[in-house]
Regions:
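Short, low-complexity disordered leader/linker segments with a strong preference
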Residues: 2, 21-28
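Bacterial N-terminal signal peptides that target proteins for export
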Residues: 2-13
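Extracytoplasmic copper-binding redox domains, predominantly the cupredoxin/blue-copper superfamily
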Residues: 25-230
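Bacterial N-terminal signal peptides
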Residues: 11-22
């Protein structure tokens, strides 16, 4: 028994409808990876002399406003892929540890929360303020292992400080764009970057660099090295 043209047409139509209902296909490994190394010629800053609670904090602390190693590799630089949005809010863990914020720089998406835990057996009085002066919170953390969670609703840079230990500084880079932070070796990596020309922007608390454009290809990695300066 032969198959009519009508039967073939209906079968094809059924397949087309099923594909449409399933939505657009996504290729495994779609998007590329951007890697790089960030350096600076600026010297490391002088250590901080501790004036309160030296038994917990130590006699001195490294000044990580410029966290650079002996070969110029620069840590704590936020690298952002401009226009590449990240949907789900995410929280940022942050510790008070030996009278320093650990990590010093963290990324956070608008609507997420910073979850602060004190590891120190001394009083920390935490402040968080936006660049426009808006105060997000002012909380006391008098005992170790106390965790407090506070939401951050708007994009921008939030500065963290402690009025008890005035040298303490930390930063929350709040953004809904794909971002990463350079490590002690100056290296960063952004995964699942859409194919095409992407502009990278760089934020550091002290140093600067101009934006850089890179061409990303699906399933491939592209490397970019950047030098920051004052």
């Amino acid at each position: 028994m032969g198959i009519s043209r009508k039967t073939v047409y209906l079968a094809a139509l059924t397949c087309a409808v099923a594909i449409a209902m399933a939505g657009p296909s996504v290729r495994a490994g779609a998007g590329g990876t951007v890697t790089g190394t960030i350096t600076t010629k600026e010297p490391a800053m002088k250590p901080i002399s501790v004036t309160i609670d030296p038994g917990v904090c130590g006699q001195s602390l490294p000044n990580e406003a410029i966290a650079v190693d002996g070969t110029g590799h620069l840590a704590n630089v936020v690298v952002t892929a401009t226009g590449v949005k990240v949907q789900a809010p995410a929280d940022a863990p942050l510790n008070n540890e030996k009278c320093s914020f650990v990590p010093r720089v963290a990324t956070l998406r608008p609507g997420g929360s910073v979850k602060m835990t004190s590891k120190d057996p001394v009083l920390h009085t935490m402040h968080a303020a936006a660049a426009d002066g808006k105060a997000y919170f002012n909380v006391s953390m008098p005992i170790p292992n106390l965790t407090i969670s506070k939401p951050i609703d708007k994009p921008g840079v939030v500065t963290l400080s402690c009025s008890t230990h005035t040298w303490m500084r930390g930063y929350l880079f709040v953004t809904d764009e794909l971002s990463g932070i350079s490590g002690r070796d100056g290296k960063f990596q952004l995964d699942n970057v859409p194919a095409g020309v992407v502009e990278l922007r760089f934020w550091h608390e002290t140093l600067k660099a101009a934006p850089v454009k890179v061409t990303v290809k699906d399933g491939q990695s592209v490397n970019v090295d950047v030098v920051l300066a004052k």
